[in-house]
């Protein structure tokens, strides 16, 4: 079975959290890619979704999600809705997902897909992801699906005590980072090299 093949690949890549694997199995990735790419939907690779954006490789979705949910977050902020695939995976794992997308056409399509899957524990906003969603915070966890040139202060400010921020950071050389808040203190860990589209700061489209 094509889904099981992907799950086996993720397990071989050291994805161990059964909750993450179950969520990925539940989300039909073919709904989140262009019809012409549907035959590649369950491949462990990133795919273009238009507007210069991509749907992330399932391994990276699983890796970031696994890091994010270790503190069992209830309310999660996602920066960069994109196709809505990562949003859908999160929606199977947490109480509520707040997601921000700066490209209106992508946000519209993502909302349609999430409704189609009866995922109603998602609030979506068209806006500048660098700013987060301050009036809905603080958040137990924040996930960023595009690479910031530096860690946005607005996002660390919206992180609850005990919360986790998972994001790619860098321009030409990017690393996946995990930032944790304990009271007023932030600790940061660099995890692995990655490659993401850039997180744009500025006017929405």
Swiss-Prot record:
NCBIfam families: pimt (TIGR00080), PRK00312.1 (NF001453). CDD domains: AdoMet_MTases. The keyword Cytoplasm applies. The gene is pcm. Belongs to the methyltransferase superfamily. L-isoaspartyl/D-aspartyl protein methyltransferase family. It is found in: Cytoplasm. It comes from Aeromonas salmonicida (strain A449). It comes from the Bacteria. The keyword Nucleotidyltransferase does not apply. One of its GO terms (molecular function) is protein-L-isoaspartate (D-aspartate) O-methyltransferase activity. Catalyzes the methyl esterification of L-isoaspartyl residues in peptides and proteins that result from spontaneous decomposition of normal L-aspartyl and L-asparaginyl residues. It plays a role in the repair and/or degradation of damaged proteins. Keywords: Cytoplasm, Methyltransferase, S-adenosyl-L-methionine, Transferase. Its main location: cytoplasm. It is an enzyme of class 2 (transferase). Its EC number is 2.1.1.77. This is Protein-L-isoaspartate O-methyltransferase. The lineage of its organism: Bacteria, Pseudomonadati, Pseudomonadota, Gammaproteobacteria, Aeromonadales.
């Amino acid at each position: 079975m094509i889904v099981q093949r992907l799950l086996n690949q993720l397990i071989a890549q050291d994805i161990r959290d059964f909750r993450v694997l179950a969520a990925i199995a539940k989300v039909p990735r073919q709904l989140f890619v262009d019809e012409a790419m549907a035959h590649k939907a369950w491949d462990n690779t990133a795919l273009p979704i238009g507007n210069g954006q991509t749907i992330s490789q399932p391994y990276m979705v699983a890796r970031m999600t696994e890091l994010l949910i270790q503190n069992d977050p209830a309310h999660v902020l996602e920066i960069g809705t994109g196709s809505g695939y990562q949003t859908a995976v999160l929606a199977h794992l947490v109480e509520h997902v707040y997601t921000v997308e700066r490209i209106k056409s992508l946000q519209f399509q993502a909302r349609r897909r999430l409704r189609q899957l009866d995922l109603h524990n998602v609030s979506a906003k068209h806006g500048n992801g660098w700013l987060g969603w301050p009036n809905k915070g603080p958040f137990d966890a924040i996930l960023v699906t595009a690479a910031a040139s530096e860690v946005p202060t607005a996002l660390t400010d919206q992180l609850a005590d005990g919360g986790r921020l998972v994001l790619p950071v860098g321009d030409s050389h990017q690393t996946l980072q995990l930032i944790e808040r304990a009271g007023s203190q932030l600790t940061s860990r660099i995890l692995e090299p990655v490659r993401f589209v850039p997180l744009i700061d500025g006017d929405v489209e």
